[in-house]
């Protein structure tokens, strides 16, 4: 078989990490290719007179007064801790918020929004002081996340807008007093990590029954913070939650406390445990093993049971708070024996029924609890996309749909259309553009959440809901046809991952696929195509991506391929694992909205910026060697230290699936660390390197154990200075010689000016070796799966 024949057996999959449909038909599938049929109705906002908007609701909190339905609290607070909404396109200040729902309104409606423009935060934790003040108001404590603050608001339940001081947006900031919790830090702040804030990042909150002690889950501090004498001296005590392995990061998230305040429970995202702390002694008294990635915590009314949502395990752990033992683990999957993927996050209780928000299956599991450890799932309720928070008030279930039920082309508009936007561009929203201050909004801000109010179903209604959920998730109805009914004839897959391009930007003007089937695209958006959308301003025709189009027409045009990602972090996880975990979905939004943290989503955990940073001294000094930098980076790869990557899904990655199937695989650029000769020299000089970096790769190592020995050590990971294939100069040189010299930068280029490292050059050299061996009659060493990352599509 000659090289041309080998190439003809390849299946080249060209994807972007934010592919979405061009259609706005509400009957068509939304992200992930599944229809959404949310039960109930959307909660309205009385200010805007349209559906209330929230950026990734993560919790609901009921007010402690007795002025509401049934003599319970009048208000329900939705805690919106995602990237944040964007009021207009003039800036990128993602505004998190607290939405105040008046349960006395008919129907319940949002009557106040308190906005926290970045870097301000409402980060997961919101609690009321249970003790009312003389005027009937309550203190309201709110985690400030990145800024290491605990905000203190006053809540007046008799008022129509109960929270003071307010921040109604769009150009307001929170002016409430706060408690500085930087004192919980065990490490100094650095401009190279967490945007120069001390690594504390308060998240979940709980408060003692007397209202005088606050408990804080410090997500980057790996600790429980205790603030005693809350009204006066405010003494801070830190309880380290790490195990003996101090290089194991546990990421505390939620906290719950018993009324007697003799025990506090902390869910730790990366420890598979709920840690029990005795506050009086500031000491850990138990570690209760639960499922992978424990997230939400909920105590029953008697505080005898603690329910724990295990997001990466598709389960809920039940802990006996007397013995601090897990007495039951309830599966909330659709059936046993299937891989995890529901991602339970939010919890709510009503009597003996536990409601569990399954974020990735767009459903709420209804669990009938049993004291004898025989709890069972009664059925499922359909929701919007990514249900991430739940509350029950009377006979109404409130569902925070983290990614909404359909959005238009502004982060301030949500609806029930089932539509997702086709990426930001100048026309969005249609007919307005930038002149109206709405066009061109950021993609992560566009995908926002909303709140559904659902009447609790009786048994027949729950049965109908369950069938709908099963249909939505492809478990009922016609079976989808397999690409190949029998054994696949495909021997090799070369999976090319690019990003920051929508389908329509590249293929929107392709009229038909290779077999003649009409393609579904919008040619006006095809700015990287070959039609009118790609024409120069003077009207001159351009054909910008002929190779992409040739591959798509030969091997497959995925015009109906849906991916539930909005940016690089979740995009690379969807691309390589077909999943994005709770950690990725939450933490990347905080990071991308300029609320600190670091890029934790491709195998590193808490890696500081080791590269030259303007205004900061070098981490290493002028005599640093390559291995010094490499060893520093290895300190932040969890598997090298007996730990787990907090971002890692239980089903792992495509290459792990290949290994389980007995297939060979090789990786080019994904989940790797690389250093070039120019990188090391730039670190020595503490000066940013210049484009293009075609210098040799001098160090390369995997961030996943299953990639050890399975990657090309010359191929670079993400780096905007290393060319994917060519530079402008090498391209023009090739044109000037009518193609007699290659446009690709490679190590054996005939022109010394273009000799060096490019991603395509490295891959092509290795591929030619595989092809030559096969042509010479040797065994076929081309891997069954090749994963190839091309990162230079960023604009």
Language model features with spans:
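Bacterial N-terminal signal peptides that target proteins for export
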Residues: 1-10
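Alpha-helix initiation/capping motif
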Residues: 2, 228, 278, 320, ...
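Positively charged, low-complexity intrinsically disordered regions
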Residues: 5-6, 236, 351, 717
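Small/flexible residues
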Residues: 6, 51, 64, 151, ...
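A short, polar/charged loop/turn motif at coil->beta-strand junctions and beta-hairpin connectors
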Residues: 9, 43-47, 173, 552, ...
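A periodicity- and composition-biased signal for non-globular, repetitive helical segments
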Residues: 10-11, 21, 507
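Predominantly soluble domains enriched in secretory-pathway, periplasmic, or organellar proteins
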Residues: 14-481, 486-487
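N-terminal pro-sequences and low-complexity stem/linker regions of secreted or lumenal proteins
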Residues: 447, 462-795
